[in-house]
């Protein structure tokens, strides 16, 4: 940060150079030295370490001068009201150009909370050139549903709308949950479904309706998410088979402990536990997608019965 003794060689001067929530520095993407440094990094990791692509995390913070903090993007005018950092947008387009020139097979994915149009549109069409954007609304919707409604109250029409509410011209990565739900302080979907029963009733001979219900809903949530994904699907390690604990990397707040910096893969290998059934379902689900080419089609409803809560889509 103070390579030449100053605070703003590569960053904005003053308060603009500091992110108020993250405590990190903010690059001035209008400086040629910053562009050279960042673009050379994109090239370096592809060539030297054979990376197969990049996921650009939290680009909402880059796109807007206020970082999109405490802001709801409810209309298109909010994307183009002078609050956008055009230099950052230019850098993202240049980064995609460089990455795809160095390795045409490389994949780039953008995580943007605001939903800015054009993030995953071709540069030639005025977009930023990302191959995919994260479908951020889907995991939030599942968590909201699990928190606020019993499963018998779920409305299939609303569910289908939320899972397919994305721009057709931009490819998206859908997912039911990710690292955000698996880190300390949050709960995975399976833990929300079965709670403490996960520690005592996951044996193959245990009879527990909470576990039975939780496993069935866990499978259904993943199947309907991948079935409506259309472009791509994301999973986070261990979540596919209901790992019971969170991940917490060593930090000052936990006394630099490694106790939860792990995944207990022995659980899914234990034939006396039911975790393996969730894992078998996930493998079969992924194989089905590979065999049928689901991601080549957009889901369309064929039959919708709101009274009986029935939905058939293809």
Where is each model-derived feature located?
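Short acidic-aromatic active-site loops that bind/stabilize oxyanions
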Residues: 27-31, 211, 271-275
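Alpha-helical packing segments of well-folded alpha/beta enzyme cores
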Residues: 34, 38-45, 91, 95, ...
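Substrate-binding/active-site clefts of carbohydrate-active enzymes
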Residues: 1-84
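Residue-level signal for pocket-adjacent positions within structured domains
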Residues: 6, 22-24, 129, 179, ...
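Conserved alpha/beta catalytic core and glycan-binding cleft of carbohydrate-active enzymes
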Residues: 50-52, 70-252, 258, 290-314
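Short clusters of hydrophobic/aromatic residues that line enzyme substrate/ligand-binding pockets
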Residues: 7-11, 27, 134, 184, ...
């Amino acid at each position: 940060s103070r390579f030449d003794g100053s605070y703003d060689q590569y960053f904005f001067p003053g308060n603009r150079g500091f992110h108020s929530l993250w405590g990190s520095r903010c690059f001035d993407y209008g400086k040629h030295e910053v562009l050279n440094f960042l673009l050379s990094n994109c090239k370096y990791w592809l060539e030297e370490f054979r990376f197969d692509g990049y996921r650009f995390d939290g680009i909402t913070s880059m796109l807007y001068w206020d970082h999109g903090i405490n802001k709801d993007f409810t209309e298109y005018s909010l994307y183009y009201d002078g609050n956008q950092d055009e230099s950052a947008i230019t850098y993202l387009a240049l980064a995609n150009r460089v990455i795809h020139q160095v390795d045409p097979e490389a994949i780039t994915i953008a995580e943007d909370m605001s939903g800015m149009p054009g993030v995953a549109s071709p540069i030639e069409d005025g977009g930023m050139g990302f191959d995919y954007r994260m479908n951020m609304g889907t995991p939030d919707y599942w968590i909201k549903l699990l928190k606020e409604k019993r499963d018998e109250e779920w409305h299939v029409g609303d569910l289908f709308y939320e899972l397919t509410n994305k721009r057709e011209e931009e490819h998206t990565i859908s997912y039911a949950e990710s690292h955000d739900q698996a880190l300390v302080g949050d709960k995975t979907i399976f833990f929300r479904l079965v709670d403490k029963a996960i520690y005592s009733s996951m044996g193959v001979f245990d009879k527990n309706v909470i576990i039975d219900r939780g496993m069935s809903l866990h499978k259904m949530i993943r199947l309907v998410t991948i079935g409506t994904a259309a472009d791509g699907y994301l999973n986070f390690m261990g979540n596919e088979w209901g790992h019971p604990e969170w991940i917490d990397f060593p930090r000052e707040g936990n006394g630099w402990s490694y106790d939860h910096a792990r995944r207990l893969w022995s659980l899914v290998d234990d034939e006396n536990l039911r975790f393996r059934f969730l894992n078998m379902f996930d493998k079969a689900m992924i194989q089905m997608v590979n065999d049928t080419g689901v991601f080549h089609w957009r889901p369309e409803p064929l039959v919708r019965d709101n009274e009986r809560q029935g939905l058939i889509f293809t």
